[in-house]
């Protein structure tokens, strides 16, 4: 596990304690019991792929620990509308405050502005956060295998599905993938960024894709920058993508998405 991830996870444990002191778990559980149905994140991804289209999870991200502020002019609702118009299948919204300058409010703003299913992009380590995601309005949560023990992975994914949430399980290497496929969730993300060096190589996805069961949706994450990158993935039967920084640095994120995935010569 990388030093930055260790730092983030230590902070998350404190954050959960702080939040549960303000809003007790029992209250969150009660509030989660009578909510509208989620929008169907995994189903939307599967439908795009079945139609022969790339399934794009477009990320709403202001900053990152490695890059600092990526998008100073940051308006989540406008970005969400732009992404939907540009052809995104789903959204990913960063809610981590301390390391990514995210916010729960950003998720609500983005989701309220469009009809797309939304992933809460955060470091989920405790059942409290799963209930919290459901109450916030998320349709899917992220579980990072390198941050969790097998029992946590099983418990958190099981709770999420019980609450009607989809789960994207993220891996970085073959050992993590072997653990991930034991969890009965339809979405497996392969992060092309090495957590120790922060280097990005698309070869990570290509090397691991054959080990992903055919009944799962393989989502390639990080490093998709050019149409050639997209074509490389699609020619290797990788049809689901999570892209953030490339779009966030563009004046019009949705137009950047359209050009990258849907503009053909």
Swiss-Prot record:
Q: SUPFAM superfamilies, alphabetically?
A: Ribulose-phoshate binding barrel (SSF51366)
The UniProt entry's GO biological process terms, in alphabetical order, are:
L-tryptophan biosynthetic process
**Could you tell me which species this protein originates from?**
Xanthomonas oryzae pv. oryzae (strain PXO99A)
For this protein, what reaction is catalysed? 1-(2-carboxyphenylamino)-1-deoxy-D-ribulose 5-phosphate + H(+) = (1S,2R)-1-C-(indol-3-yl)glycerol 3-phosphate + CO2 + H2O
User: What family does this chain come from, according to its entry?
Assistant: Belongs to the TrpC family.
Q: Which UniProt keywords apply?
A: Amino-acid biosynthesis, Aromatic amino acid biosynthesis, Decarboxylase, Lyase, Tryptophan biosynthesis
Pfam assignment, any one: IGPS
Which pathway or pathways does this protein act in? Amino-acid biosynthesis; L-tryptophan biosynthesis; L-tryptophan from chorismate: step 4/5
List the EC numbers from the record: 4.1.1.48
Q: Which domain of life is it from?
A: Bacteria
**InterPro entries on file:** Aldolase_TIM (IPR013785), Indole-3-glycerol_P_synth (IPR045186), Indole-3-glycerol_P_synth_dom (IPR013798), Indole-3-GlycerolPSynthase_CS (IPR001468), RibuloseP-bd_barrel (IPR011060)
Task: Give the encoding gene's name.
Answer: trpC
What is the name of this protein?
A: Indole-3-glycerol phosphate synthase
Q: Which GO terms describe its molecular function?
A: indole-3-glycerol-phosphate synthase activity; phosphoribosylanthranilate isomerase activity
Q: Which Gene3D superfamilies does the record cross-reference, listed alphabetically?
A: Aldolase class I (3.20.20.70)
């Amino acid at each position: 596990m990388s030093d930055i991830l260790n730092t983030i996870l230590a902070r998350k444990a404190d954050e959960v304690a702080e939040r549960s002191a303000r809003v007790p778990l029992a209250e969150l559980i009660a509030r989660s019991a009578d909510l509208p149905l989620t929008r169907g994140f995994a189903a939307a991804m599967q439908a795009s792929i079945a139609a022969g289209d790339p399934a794009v999870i477009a990320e709403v991200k202001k900053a990152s620990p490695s890059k600092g502020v990526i998008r100073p002019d940051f308006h989540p609702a406008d970005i969400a509308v732009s992404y939907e118009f540009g052809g995104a299948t789903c959204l990913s919204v960063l809610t981590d405050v301390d390391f990514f300058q995210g916010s729960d409010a950003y998720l609500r703003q983005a989701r309220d502005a469009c009809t797309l299913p939304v992933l809460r992009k955060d470091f989920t380590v405790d059942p409290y956060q799963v209930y919290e995601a459901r109450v916030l309005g998320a349709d899917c949560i992220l579980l990072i295998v390198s941050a969790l023990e097998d029992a946590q992975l099983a418990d958190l994914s099981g709770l999420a599905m019980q609450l009607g949430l989809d789960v994207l399980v993220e891996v970085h290497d073959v050992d993590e993938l072997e653990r991930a496929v034991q969890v009965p969730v339809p979405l497996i993300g392969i992060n092309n960024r090495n957590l120790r060096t922060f280097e990005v190589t698309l070869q990570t996805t290509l090397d691991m894709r054959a080990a992903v069961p055919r009944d799962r949706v393989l989502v390639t994450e990080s490093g998709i920058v050019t149409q050639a990158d997209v074509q490389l993935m699609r020619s290797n039967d990788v049809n689901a993508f999570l892209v953030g920084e490339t779009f966030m640095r563009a004046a019009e994120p949705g137009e950047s998405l359209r050009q990258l995935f849907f503009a053909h010569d």
